[in-house]
């Protein structure tokens, strides 16, 4: 380790000897930064306040300048941190994206450049230089940081509503951006990275953080246990928002608020009285956003040469974030962000046949086509951990949900999963299924849904509820149109005795003479053709997508269907029955613009029996119509 540190020191000293820097080099630096940490000489400067501030341009930056940064180490009040400017690293973060290198003293020399310090404003001679936003390497004994010039951050106000291509979302799983300076300058062990934005999760189980850690790591997000000063159910700005988020104070972007909280913590760089700049780098680089913006209270800063972090609570919502860009975030004080109110009722039966225990959760979810489905999955999985802690290994989970969207009828969805019935744990299967419904809605061709509210009931039973269709038969082999026929089905429950279900139906009066088949099946067999037809068309509109989801049959029921020999064509969300052969041939032609899936038979529903358990298997019966 001593050899590695010595090599880094030598490389850094060589870089600092450069008299006149070129692109990607340190310009104008003539002394080593690895001496004494900067300290105060006299009284520390007065704390900055909201309002217009003079700016020190990058062209005026000189090595050796002394300044002050403001950040919160504990509580809500920012403290001054001595700063010494090392030099200007030109084009280090992209074309015309300069970075100012600096060394921190005071408490920051002990904690190092910590996650959550992103956005801490730096002043030289009373002029705003920029925001602490980057760190150089790890295991450094010195608190060396990169400062995003305030000139670049102010450009956020002029950016349009376009969304960047390199967004950090749960589906793109973009790795954290890391910019390696030239090896000839700083050595192979040194690199420039944005300071981690700790994603604080309050009200979440340790098992949830553990199971979702791969998602967070691939997005370059550090997920930590966090807190909130009481559950925040209202997204309206709290009283006194006019005086909130002064420069140097903690700022949080809120992805989930309520009984569960997910927030990203940083520091305020600039406040003009209405708009706020922070972070000095992107949150998730989402572009235009509508995310609740809150104040924060820091509990402590964990010192570390590897990954120091602030631990903080979200306190009050005071506005809304409007932009999330490469050089920082921009928020509007007093604005209210639109979110999705979610209500979850959890019912658990600890003992088979015993009473149910109930819990209710309320929270609001950030609206974004990529993040909303993931947050629905995360929160649902977390509530199931409450159940999983007291359930047996062989448990069954059920979700019944309602999604209300503007201009559409309520979308009712249900699903059941049992432990050991899939490649992943049952709670994760159910949470992933729930998230997929939102993902399909938000990926509609003609716009995003305006979700007004979401309600769901999660139920756990401490035994594996699953039944397999063993056999089926009819009480007669022949019947006339209009006559009643009795169908019986033998099912084998998981580790249980064989049971028989009876279903009565009348032969349709318009059914032609001849042999027909009665299909006894689970939901999956009937859902498959329509699901495949939907996948074949990637250009489904919102109404069509919602229709497809609404038509899905529940997997805890036994279905009875009549099969006829006439073909059915599935186009988008609509089945077309009794299609003439000529029309079918035209629709299946390579020249046809319609994406259709054809089945040789038509399935006519006769009825269903709710079983309250998962159903698997199928059986086909023959019935002759006289």
Sequence positions of predicted segments:
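Bacterial N-terminal signal peptides
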Residues: 5-17
């Amino acid at each position: 380790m001593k050899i590695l540190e010595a090599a880094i020191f030598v490389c850094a000293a060589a870089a600092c000897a450069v008299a006149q820097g070129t692109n990607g080099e340190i310009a104008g630096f003539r002394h080593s930064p690895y001496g004494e940490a900067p300290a105060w000489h006299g009284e520390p400067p007065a704390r900055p306040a909201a309002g217009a501030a003079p700016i020190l341009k990058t062209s005026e930056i000189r090595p050796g300048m002394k300044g002050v940064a403001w950040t919160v180490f504990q509580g809500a009040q920012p403290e001054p941190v001595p700063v010494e400017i090392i030099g200007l690293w030109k084009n280090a973060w992209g074309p015309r994206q300069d970075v100012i290198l600096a060394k921190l003293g005071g408490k920051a020399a002990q904690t190092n450049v910590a996650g959550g310090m992103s956005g801490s404003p730096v002043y030289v001679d009373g002029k705003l230089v920029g925001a602490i936003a980057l760190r150089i390497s790890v295991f450094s004994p010195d608190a060396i940081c990169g400062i995003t010039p305030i000139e670049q951050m102010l450009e956020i106000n002029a950016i349009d509503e376009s969304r960047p291509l390199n967004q950090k979302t749960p589906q793109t799983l973009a790795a954290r951006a890391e910019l390696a300076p030239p090896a000839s300058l700083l050595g192979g062990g040194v690199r420039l990275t944005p300071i981690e934005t700790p994603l604080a999760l309050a009200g979440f189980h340790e098992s949830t953080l553990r199971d979702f850690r791969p998602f967070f790591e691939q997005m370059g997000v550090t997920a930590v246990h966090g807190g909130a000063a009481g559950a925040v159910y209202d997204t309206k700005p709290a009283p006194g928002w006019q005086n909130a988020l002064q420069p140097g104070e903690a700022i949080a972007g809120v992805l989930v608020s309520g009984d569960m909280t997910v927030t990203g913590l940083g520091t305020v760089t600039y406040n003009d009285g209405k708009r706020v700049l922070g972070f000095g780098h992107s949150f998730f680089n989402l572009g235009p956003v509508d995310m609740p913006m809150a104040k924060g209270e820091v509990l402590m800063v964990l010192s570390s040469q590897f990954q120091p972090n602030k631990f903080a609570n979200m306190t009050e919502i005071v506005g809304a974030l409007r932009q999330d860009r490469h050089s920082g975030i921009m928020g509007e004080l007093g604005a209210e962000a639109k979110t999705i109110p979610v209500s979850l009722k959890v019912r658990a039966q600890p003992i088979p046949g015993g009473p149910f225990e109930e819990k209710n959760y309320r929270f609001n979810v950030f609206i974004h086509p990529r993040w909303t489905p993931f947050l629905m999955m995360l929160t649902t999985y977390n509530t199931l951990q409450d159940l999983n802690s007291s359930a047996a290994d062989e448990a069954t989970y059920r979700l019944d949900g309602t999604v209300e969207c503007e201009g559409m009828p309520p979308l009712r969805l249900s699903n059941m999963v049992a432990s050991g019935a899939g490649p992943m744990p049952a709670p994760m299967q159910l949470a992933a299924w729930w998230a997929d419904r939102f993902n399909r809605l938000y990926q509609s061709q003609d716009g995003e849904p305006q979700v007004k509210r979401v309600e769901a009931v999660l139920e756990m039973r401490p035994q594996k509820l699953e039944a397999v269709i063993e056999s089926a038969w009819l009480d007669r082999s022949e019947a006339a149109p209009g006559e009643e026929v009795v169908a019986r089905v033998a099912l084998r429950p998981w580790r249980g005795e064989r049971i028989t279900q009876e279903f009565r139906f009348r032969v349709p009066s318009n059914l032609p003479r001849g042999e027909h088949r009665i299909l006894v099946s689970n939901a999956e067999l009937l859902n498959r053709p329509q699901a495949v037809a939907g996948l074949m068309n990637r250009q489904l509109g919102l109404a069509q997508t919602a229709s497809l989801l609404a038509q899905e049959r529940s997997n805890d029921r036994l279905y009875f269907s009549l099969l006829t020999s006439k073909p059915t064509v599935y186009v988008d969300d609509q089945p077309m029955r009794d299609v003439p052969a000529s029309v079918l041939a035209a629709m299946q032609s390579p020249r046809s613009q319609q994406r259709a899936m054809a089945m040789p038979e038509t399935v006519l529903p006769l009825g269903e029996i709710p079983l309250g358990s998962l159903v698997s298997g199928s059986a086909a019966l023959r019935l002759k119509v006289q």
